[in-house]
């Protein structure tokens, strides 16, 4: 099945029948729309990326692709747009209404979002690098590279752990050392 929703009682709510995807984002994207929405990418070389109502499965936007769209991302990275922005390898950047606001942006990570620099926008974590999207110039700026540290799971490039460990609402990143002998906890100095 994949691309399905399970209700609070454990029963299936719906299936889009679009199969498995490597990334799915569930949140309240659009402040003017009731309920939660889903941004999902599909590996079936047909359905591309879909933005849908989480409760009903109604597709709000679909960007079809004949490729395996293995990665998509959603985070609030542009303060000029209400709600959460979304993008994928194939879709360019969309606002919470599903409208195109930027084409494919070179180097825009599609891996993880992190609260790093203390402002209300998200930063982007990919491998051992944290970047910030510059919405004015529509480009990505590197904030920090964690030298001597590696991510996990090959192409998935995920940290050992990411979360607010210190308790200041920013998030810390836990990575393994290159020699696999230790774990390193990185804390924002911004």
Predicted regions and their residues:
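Extracytoplasmic/lumenal domain signature
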Residues: 1-190
């Amino acid at each position: 099945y994949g691309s399905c929703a399970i209700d609070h009682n454990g029963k299936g709510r719906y299936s889009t029948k679009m199969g498995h995807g490597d990334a799915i984002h569930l949140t309240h994207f659009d402040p003017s729309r009731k309920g939660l929405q889903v941004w999902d990418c599909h590996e079936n070389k047909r359905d591309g990326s879909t933005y849908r109502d989480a409760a009903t499965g109604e597709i709000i936007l679909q960007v079809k692709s004949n490729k395996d769209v293995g990665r998509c991302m959603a985070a609030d990275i542009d303060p000029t747009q209400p709600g959460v922005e979304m993008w994928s390898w194939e879709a360019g950047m969309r606002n919470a209404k599903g409208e195109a606001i930027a084409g494919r942006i070179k180097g825009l990570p599609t891996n993880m979002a992190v609260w790093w620099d203390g402002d209300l926008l998200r930063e982007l974590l990919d491998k051992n690098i944290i970047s910030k999207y510059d919405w004015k110039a529509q480009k990505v700026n590197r904030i920090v590279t964690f030298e001597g540290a590696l991510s996990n799971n090959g192409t998935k490039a995920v940290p050992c752990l990411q979360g607010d460990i210190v308790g200041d609402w920013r998030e810390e990143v836990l990575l393994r050392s290159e020699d696999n002998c230790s774990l390193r906890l990185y804390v924002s100095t911004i």
